[in-house]
Amino acid sequence: RDAQESRGLGDVYKRQPYEMAEYLARDLTMLQEINPDTISLSPFVPREGTSFRHQLPCNLETFLRLTAILRVMFPKANIAASPLVNSIHVQGQVMAIYSGANVLRVPLFPPPVPGVTRRSGGVSLLRRLQSLYASLSSHNYEMVVDRGDSLRFLERHPKAPAQKN
């Protein structure tokens, strides 16, 4: 393991089919043991063609509550809000920021859609980024594009490259 490696945890999907409260409690206990620098949180959203296509999606309130719980448990970790939360609510990622997430994952390229050129897809992505920026700025949040080291990582590695602001 590299001495400057950040400890991250892959996607934590919430409100999975058949999930029970004790599973969530076990997951949170495991997270405390791992004590990750980064937690990527994604809601469960059913998809056609899968065995769970008829299951209910994650409730937005549940997702936001879990985001807030993770922020209290891990005040110095990066908590990433997946763009998938926008399929539950159009402002899902922004609401996740208000609930404690501090990283927005934004796809670099929009998904391929028949009849949409890469240029018009890029314009759509630019509009989405501008909308995110405006929404966050209106609530005194600053959106930056940088390396994204967590506060825990920077405390352990004070000579790590400084973040750009």
Question: Residue locations for each model-derived region?
Answer:
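Extended alpha-helical regions
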Residues: 7, 25-32, 45
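Auxiliary Fe-S-binding modules of radical SAM enzymes
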Residues: 32-165
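Residues within alpha-helical segments
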Residues: 1-4, 28, 97
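Active-site-proximal beta-alpha loop/turn segments in soluble metabolic enzymes
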Residues: 10-19, 47-53
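Active-site glycine- and acidic-residue-rich loops that bind
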Residues: 14-28, 83-90
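Single conserved hydrophobic/aromatic residue that forms the stacking wall/gate
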Residues: 1-9, 13
